[in-house]
């Protein structure tokens, strides 16, 4: 019998993501609040957002109260993680126009470019530099001229500490 890797998003442990990520990333909420503040200052009325790695729902939870009339596209290859995003929005009673894609970004074609694109805490899950470069390029190709793209990444192993 093979065991599921707990770092794969279809593993049942992934459902604990929203609880565990805050203990692993100092200032987790601040990353998203600063991003929302930058969007507010630079574009008072963004029409649409592309959220890459949308599982957990943090970006949606942060943006929707400030930009309730915007359209959102949430992309994540994990059904479990998208389920968490939907559950979080229901618990917070946040409503918006959201299209969910349980796909990798490279497998989805959009008819429009986006005013804002985000990719937070995703790149470190990709194995090679080529995969990371490909994802960043795909995001850049989906940002409208004058639009904004936000990235954050972990550059170390989460379960190890260096001294």
Describe each region flagged by the PLM.
Residues 118:
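A conserved beta-strand element that flanks and buttresses the S-adenosyl-L-methionine
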Residues 133-145:
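A short glycine-rich, Lys/Arg-flanked "PGG" loop and its adjoining helix->strand segment in the class I
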Residues 148-163:
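Conserved class I S-adenosyl-L-methionine
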Residues 48-52, 56-107:
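Class I SAM-dependent methyltransferase SAM/SAH-binding core
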Residues 121-125:
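Short catalytic micro-motifs in class I SAM-dependent methyltransferases
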Residues 48, 147-148:
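Short glycine-centered segments of the SAM/dcSAM-binding site in methyltransferase folds
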Residues 27-45:
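Conserved alpha-helix/loop element of class I SAM-dependent methyltransferases that forms part
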Residues 1-16:
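N-terminal, positively charged/glycine-rich alpha-helical extensions of SAM-dependent methyltransferases
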């Amino acid at each position: 019998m093979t065991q599921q890797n707990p770092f794969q998003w279809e593993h049942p442990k992934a459902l604990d993501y929203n609880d565990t990520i805050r203990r692993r990333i100092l200032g987790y909420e601040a990353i998203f609040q600063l991003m929302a503040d930058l969007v507010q200052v630079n574009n008072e009325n963004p029409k649409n957002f592309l959220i890459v790695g949308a599982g957990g729902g943090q970006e949606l939870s942060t943006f929707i109260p400030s930009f309730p009339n915007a359209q959102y596209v949430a992309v994540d290859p994990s059904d479990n993680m998208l389920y968490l995003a939907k559950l979080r929005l229901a618990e917070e009673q946040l409503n918006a126009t959201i299209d969910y894609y349980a796909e990798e970004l490279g497998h989805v074609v959009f008819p429009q470019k986006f005013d804002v694109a985000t990719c937070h805490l995703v790149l470190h899950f990709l194995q090679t530099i080529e995969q990371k470069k490909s994802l960043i390029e795909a995001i850049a190709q989906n940002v409208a001229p004058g639009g904004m793209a936000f990235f954050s990444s972990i550059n170390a192993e989460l379960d190890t500490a260096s001294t």
